[in-house]
Each structure stands twice: as structure tokens, then as C-alpha cells.
From Swiss-Prot:
Keyword flag Transferase: yes
Encoding gene (name): lipA
Cofactor note: Binds 2 [4Fe-4S] clusters per subunit. One cluster is coordinated with 3 cysteines and an exchangeable S-adenosyl-L-methionine.
Protein's name according to its UniProt entry: Lipoyl synthase
Cofactor(s) needed by this chain: [4Fe-4S] cluster
Length: 290
């Protein structure tokens, strides 16, 4: 799932490189007006993404499906956890219509985890992609999926939908996975990514958050693990604490260190590497289809 981080909730003494300008520009203003008018559900707004203005200006937006309540309670994530609502079977059409209204050129679809459902929500996923393709044939797609508990028939539905990019985030290094992603497993995420590639997905992608107490060596090893799983694209960004109830930020990683990881990633053979303090899973997503 797309990492939901509120850029306004930061410890005192936050580094200057984490301060962002308010989004401006005609395209942003137009899209903001449409979102407000039609009450469209984008994770860009609900997650207070610091890159919203830039992405919207380039015709990219991220939509979250299957409700806004997750069955998992990851220590980093600002999405509500609990018992989700009944599946809205009209949601695929609603999302497709939102993309059409906003005239989105490249859409990223993500979701909460739905471990309460027999299909983990995978049927709604494929129906959403079909609806988007039908209503917006020129729009390219990235699906940022949960692990579906590694169940192959659920992953096969995503493969059958054939999005341009399929993403699944490992989020953190192996050692911290149990603390950061309580109900997920590091190796299962790698298996999911490896399976997607083996089944014919052209571009796979994963993301890592930094500042949770990981070491440089662990970050580099995680990047190696992703390459060994044939991942094409990696995003690396700064973890920001959504609220006081969530895991604290242990360290603010410098822009120079992010640049180092970017260079290392390119040397490892990733097709695209997005590495920087404000990078999120969907940052520059439209460029990842090239």
C-alpha cells in the first residue's frame, strides 16, 4: 500500500530539506477544484503528500480502493486499522470516472489490506483496472498492491490485468520488518515480487523508508535483495511519523546519503531509482513506464 505520511507532523528541529512549498500552478488548482467538487478519493490529499502539487501538475494521481480501514496495523502507516466496511462493488466505476474527470494521464492504484476477504480484495482490484481501461484507454497504470498473503490465484488476477507497472513495497530492511510491518514478512514480499516478474509483468517496483534505525549496510543489502528478485524500479524516502502513536523517527537521512543510494542503485542495474527525503512510492511514477 502507498505509504501514508503527513508532512506536517515532524519532530521539533526538522531539517530544512524537509520543508516544502505550498503546491501552486494552474493544473494543480484545476485538479484540486475537481477533487473538492466531486469528493474524489485520492491518497494524495488524504495522505497530505508533499509532492501532490508536482505530481498533479504532471497529470499523475494515486487512488486508494477497498475503503479506508485496513485489517493490518503497521507501525509506520497512518491509515486507520480495524474492521473494514462492506466492499463497494460500484467502486471500480467510481475510480475510473474520477480519473476521467481529472484527465489523469498516469494513475496509481493502491489499497488497504483486506485479510477479512476470501480473495483479499483481488477481484475488486482487477475490476477496477478493467473499468479504468474501458473508460480511460489512453491512461497508463501502476498497481501498488498488498501481499495478498502470497496467494498465487490472487496475484494471478493482477497479472491478468496487465498494468504497466506492478509495485509492492518491502518498506524497510529485514531486521526491522517485524516491528515496522507487524503482520507482514520480508521474504514473502520478495517472493511476491519475484513471482510477478516470473509471470510476465514487465516492470516491477518496490519502496523503502529510511530513518527507522536501519544501517547503511542493511539498506544496501535490501537493494541487493530487490535486484535479486528482478525488481526494476526502487523508491527510497524519509520516514515521517504520522502521529505520536506511530513509530518515532530515529534519524533524518541527509540528501547526500540519498544521492549515494541513488548512485548505488543505478550501479546495481535498477531501471529507475528515486531516492530523496521527500520521495514516496508514487513519486515520478509516470516516468517509470519508459
Amino acid at each position: 500500500m502507498e505509504t501514508v505520511l503527513d508532512s506536517n507532523i515532524l519532530p521539533v528541529g526538522k531539517p530544512k530539506w524537509l520543508k516544502v512549498k505550498l503546491p501552486i500552478g494552474q493544473k494543480y488548482t484545476e485538479l484540486r477544484g475537481l477533487v473538492d467538487k466531486y469528493k474524489l478519493n485520492t491518497i494524495c490529499t488524504s495522505g497530505s503528500c508533499p509532492n501532490m502539487g508536482e505530481c498533479w501538475g504532471e497529470g499523475t494521481a494515486t487512488f486508494m480502493i477497498l475503503g479506508n480501514i485496513c485489517t493490518r496495523s503497521c507501525g509506520f502507516c497512518g491509515v486507520k486499522t480495524g474492521r473494514p466496511e462492506t466492499v463497494d462493488w460500484d467502486e471500480p466505476e467510481k475510480v475510473a470516472r474520477s480519473i476521467k474527470i481529472m484527465n489523469i494521464k498516469h494513475a496509481v492504484i493502491t489499497s488497504v489490506d483486506r485479510d477479512d476477504l476470501k480473495d483479499m480484495g483481488s477481484i475488486i482490484w482487477i475490476e477496477t483496472v478493467k473499468a479504468i481501461r474501458r473508460m480511460n484507454p489512453e491512461t497508463t497504470l501502476e498497481t501498488l498492491i498488498p501481499d495478498f498473503q502470497g496467494v498465487e490465484r490472487n496475484l494471478d488476477r493482477i497479472v491478468a490485468a496487465n498494468p504497466e507497472v506492478v509495485s509492492h513495497n518491502v518498506e524497510t530492511v529485514r531486521r526491522l520488518t517485524r516491528e515496522v510491518r507487524i503482520q507482514a514478512k520480508y521474504d514473502k514480499s520478495l517472493e511476491v515480487l519475484r513471482y510477478l516478474k516470473a509471470k510476465g509483468i514487465k516492470r516491477t517496483k518496490s519502496g523503502i523508508m529510511l530513518g527507522l534505525g536501519e544501517t547503511e549496510e542493511e539498506v544496501i543489502q535490501t537493494m541487493r535483495d530487490l535486484r535479486e528478485a528482478n525488481v526494476d524500479i526502487v523508491t527510497i524516502g524519509q520516514y515521517l511519523q504520522p502521529s505520536k502513536k506511530h513509530l518515532p523517527v530515529k534519524e533524518f537521512i541527509t540528501p547526500e546519503q540519498f544521492e549515494k543510494y541513488e548512485l548505488l542503485g543505478k550501479e546495481m542495474g535498477f531501471r529507475h531509482v528515486e531516492s530523496g527525503p521527500l520521495v514516496r512510492s508514487s513519486y515520478h511514477a509516470q516516468k517509470h513506464i519508459l
